[in-house]
A protein has these predicted regions:
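A short helix->loop->beta-strand "cap" motif at the edges of active sites that frequently abuts
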Residues: 22, 108-111, 138-140
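Catalytic P-loop NTPase motifs of RecA-like helicase/translocase cores
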Residues: 10, 33, 120-122
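Short hydrophobic alpha-helical segments of the AMP-binding
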Residues: 34, 38, 106
């Protein structure tokens, strides 16, 4: 578990870690940072953006017809799959069945799920998962980001955390957690003591 300056910052650094030569799939609609971070890392393709988006990004429509959960069949093998639940901006929450399907797909196709759980504090139904790690096998294929901005109003204070399981690995067998530690130690000096003290108080609350 890596303490950070918020989920938004983690999302940008994660894309930088995976680099430009990775396939990326995003929910559509979704939080703009997923696409922006992908493009800034060079993974959006070299062609100019069109009304259909960036050529090298797979957009997964989330519509009433599919219960606002994407059709994973459009996702390429070895992709980073951005999933936000509850979703920003639709508010749709992925069910346990949805996330079970996602984990099975990711493991079968060599994908890594980047699960944005920033709005999980607003889930009141005990039957709906707040974390992807409630799903068996998720620790083999998923990274989860969390934020204090939504439940505690820390938008300007900046505090969050990122979970990178020890058994999550690159194709060469090296640990993603080790690469993430190097990225964060290089590009980030740590959340302030004031922010972390506020985080402890918010958790106690």
């Amino acid at each position: 578990i890596f303490v950070s300056d918020g989920a938004k910052c983690d999302l940008g650094r994660l894309q930088a870690m995976f680099g430009a030569d990775v396939n990326v799939a995003v929910q559509d609609p979704s939080y703009p940072v997923y696409v922006d971070g992908t493009v800034m890392a060079g993974a959006g393709g070299k062609e100019p953006v069109t009304e259909n988006g960036f050529k090298d990004i797979t957009y997964m429509p989330c519509l009433p017809e599919n219960g606002f959960f994407p059709d994973l069949s459009v996702v390429k093998k070895d992709s980073l799959i951005y999933i936000c639940s509850p979703n920003n901006p639709t508010g749709a929450v992925a069910t346990k069945e949805n996330l079970t399907e996602l984990v099975k797909f990711a493991k079968a196709n060599g994908c890594v799920v980047l699960f944005d759980a920033a709005y999980s504090a607003f889930i009141r139904d005990k039957n709906l998962p707040k974390s992807i790690y409630e799903i068996e096998g998720a620790k083999d294929c998923a990274i989860e980001m969390q934020s204090f901005s939504k439940p505690a109003g820390f938008t300007g204070v900046r505090l969050g955390w990122c979970v990178v399981p020890e058994n999550l690995k690159f194709d060469d067998g090296s640990k993603i957690a080790d690469a993430w530690a190097r990225i964060t130690n290089t590009a980030f000096n740590g959340a302030s003591n004031i922010a972390q003290a506020g985080g402890f108080a918010a958790l106690d609350d």
